[in-house]
A protein has these predicted regions:
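N-terminal, charge-rich interaction modules
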Residues: 1-75, 84-87, 93, 100, ...
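C-terminal folded domains that constitute the principal catalytic or ligand-binding module
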Residues: 94-178, 188
Length: 193
């Protein structure tokens, strides 16, 4: 399937999305830059310019993202990190404004890390955040600009739909524990379908 044309008009998007971009990879393949070009997100290159109270997608956070974070997402938006894990650790070590949350277990649908747990692109991570916090249509609209966007939802639909039913971070953690317990007993394909 050919890549969708990125010359379309930028969209008006209900949720404010900021992305800390460290310029560490090929700009032509970078999902954060494509989100910015299409009007879904604002690129930030300095930590000090990130919003104060937004949900920050922090892979090192001890608190999982859950539907309980919807109000904060709606009011203050989302901050995604577009950098290597090593750089993210350094960035998160600095004083980052906002409320840190880690994403629950999900499967990458992008062609680079297809099928790998937790190896999501910035766009996939933000779309997952939108979906889990109740902005399902916005999540699908966002990933629709990528030829592989539908694949992310096909791989993760069961997981995302279960995460949406969680009350809070504790429920998400329990769901993940159950998932990992089942995964030890059954082939991964059976669990994620």
């Amino acid at each position: 399937m050919a890549e969708k044309d990125h010359t379309e008009e930028p969209v008006a998007f209900a949720v404010r999305i900021n992305i800390y971009h460290a310029a560490q990879d090929d700009p032509k393949k970078n999902t954060a830059l494509r989100l910015s070009r299409r009007g879904f997100a604002r690129i930030v290159t300095k930590i000090k310019f990130l919003p104060k109270r937004a949900i920050v997608l922090n892979p090192f956070s001890e608190i999982a993202l859950s539907p309980a974070d919807r109000e904060r997402v709606e009011q203050f938006g989302i901050v995604g990190l577009d950098c290597s894990w090593e750089h993210a650790q350094k960035v998160m070590g600095e004083h980052v404004r906002g409320t840190s949350r880690c994403l629950p277990i999900l499967i990458a649908g992008n062609p680079v890390n297809f099928g790998k747990l937790t190896k999501l692109t910035t766009a996939e991570a933000i779309a997952a955040t939108l979906y889990i916090t109740g902005f399902q249509q916005e999540a699908k609209t966002m990933l629709d600009i990528f030829p592989w966007g539908h694949t992310f939802f096909e791989l993760n639909q069961k997981l995302l739909d279960s995460y949406v039913t969680a009350k809070d971070s504790t429920d998400i953690v329990e769901m993940q524990k159950e998932l990992l317990t089942v995964q030890k007993r059954e082939p991964a394909k059976c669990i994620f379908e």
